[in-house]
Regions:
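S-adenosyl-L-methionine
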Residues: 1-34, 39-40, 44
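Class I S-adenosyl-L-methionine-dependent methyltransferase module
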Residues: 47-175, 293
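Hydrophobic "anchor" residues on beta-strands that sit immediately upstream
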Residues: 28, 49, 197
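Long, positively charged, glycine-interspersed low-complexity recognition regions
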Residues: 217-300
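Mobile active-site "lid"/loop adjacent to the S-adenosyl-L-methionine
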Residues: 150-156, 204-222
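Conserved SAM/SAH-binding loop
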Residues: 182-187
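Short conserved loop adjoining the S-adenosyl-L-methionine
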Residues: 188-192
Length: 300
């Protein structure tokens, strides 16, 4: 399975073995409307993919991986690591550094990270941004209201594992015909291919991740109405969402879903918020308007 060095909230990597059998053999084209890192579509059996997101930063990152050889991406990262003095466990081994309990490598990387963050906010480049994501807390991609990157330093560095993910992820862009677009999900330009399967993984109305903060009930309604219109046109769709989370229920989604096919997915969310040490159960679903699936089949 292809994984990504980019950590987007709601990343579907752990659910791919459950999701992909439902999406497989539906079309040779997938339109990934809220693509994030694009893991679902990149792992699909579709030869043609449209990666769409309304976030211009996401689009810039996707284009970087699509248009830059993997070795160049890694070399660019190595130069930043050297120039700023970040830890390099791939080169030196973790034993070279004395990790503090609960802090990992953060004490070594705090000053280099803050220097890089300052330089990026003055003169942004995609190479600097990728380094900030790797060395930032939980690999978050977050900006404040002034457009400045404002994630604190993280606990890990550009490890051997992350280098492998970088290489695999970048090379996956060369194995399919990929178009990258930057439209709002309501934009009709996205829905011109009646033979494609459309995959939606929007922000979740009832979860508390910062990514979901700007998503309102009106957005949820607009999306569900759009899906109904696609269904009337005979266009296949699959929607990832959450129906219950931390005592909250998306009643409108549950009622709407009764018209379609609902697959319940098994995932336990390990809450990474340092203020909460618990594992929370979110009832995540995949909703489709087609039935031609062999659910539960082995998928690799």
């Amino acid at each position: 399975m292809i994984n990504s060095p980019l950590n987007y909230t709601g990343n579907k990597f752990k659910l791919l073995k459950q999701i992909m059998p439902i999406l497989s053999n539906q079309s040779d084209t997938m339109i990934d409307v809220f693509c994030g890192s694009g893991l679902v579509s990149l792992n699909s059996d579709c030869e043609n993919i449209v990666l769409n997101d309304n976030n211009p930063v996401t689009i810039s990152l996707l284009k970087y991986f699509k248009n830059t050889p993997s070795d160049t991406i890694i070399t660019n990262m190595e130069k930043i690591i050297s120039d700023y003095g970040f830890t390099d466990s791939n080169k030196n081994g973790l034993h070279y550094y004395k990790e503090e309990k609960h802090e990992g490598l953060s004490r070594y990387n705090k000053e280099p990270f803050n220097n890089l963050k300052q330089d990026y906010n003055k003169e942004p480049t995609i190479e600097k941004l990728f380094a900030l994501i790797i060395y930032g807390f939980n690999h978050y991609i977050r900006f404040n209201s002034k457009g400045l990157y404002n994630v604190p330093v993280g606990k890990v560095d550009y490890s051997t594992s992350l280098r492998s993910k970088t290489k695999e992820y970048a090379e996956s862009f060369q194995k399919k015909k990929i178009e990258i677009t930057n439209y709002d999900f309501r934009d009709e330009r996205l829905y011109q291919n009646k033979d494609a399967i459309y995959y939606f993984d929007p922000p979740y109305l009832i979860t508390q991740a910062p990514y979901n903060a700007t998503w309102k009930e009106s957005d949820d309604k607009d999306l569900l109405d759009l899906l109904d219109r696609l269904n009337k046109k005979g266009i296949k769709f699959a929607l990832s969402n959450v129906v219950n989370s931390n005592g909250k229920t998306n009643k409108a989604l549950i009622e709407w879903s009764k018209k379609y096919n609902v697959f319940y997915l098994d995932r336990k969310y390990l809450n990474s918020n340092y203020r909460k040490k618990n594992i929370t159960i979110a009832e995540e679903v995949l909703i489709t308007n087609y039935k031609e699936v062999e659910y539960g089949n082995e998928w690799k």
